[in-house]
Amino acid sequence: NEQVGRITVKGDKKLSPCNIADDSISSMIDEIPILALVCSYIDGESIISGLDELRYKESDRLIGIYNILKAMGVSVNINNNSSLAIKRGKNLYSTNNLDNLNDHRLAMVISCAQIIQGEKIDFDDCIKVSFPNFKELVETILVD
């Protein structure tokens, strides 16, 4: 069984852009897709480096993250073939019809983006690979 952690962010201030260096990535490689989504809602540029390993997961997650954020209207670039530079877009577009590349982590990111955008949530079946009760958990925390 893989260990699970919980991160709680509290505060009354806006989030600041982050700069995540290569040496931090190996311990958080599976969290990079959701971190990239969070960065897309922060004013300023965030840089996440050392993402080579994302290219060899269930899909090329680096390209998958890039395509999802770009389709949403986020200013995002891949630098040196292994880093993401992410800036909030002026207008964030619909999250409908985004391609998860049949990758469970990208599918969860799309579902989270749909929650943030207030859109209909697409719980793709591929999510069950790593988080079988994701849909049920999300439904318990959503309040109309």
Which sequence ranges carry the predicted segments?
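Short, structured segments at the rim of ligand-binding sites
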Residues: N1-D144
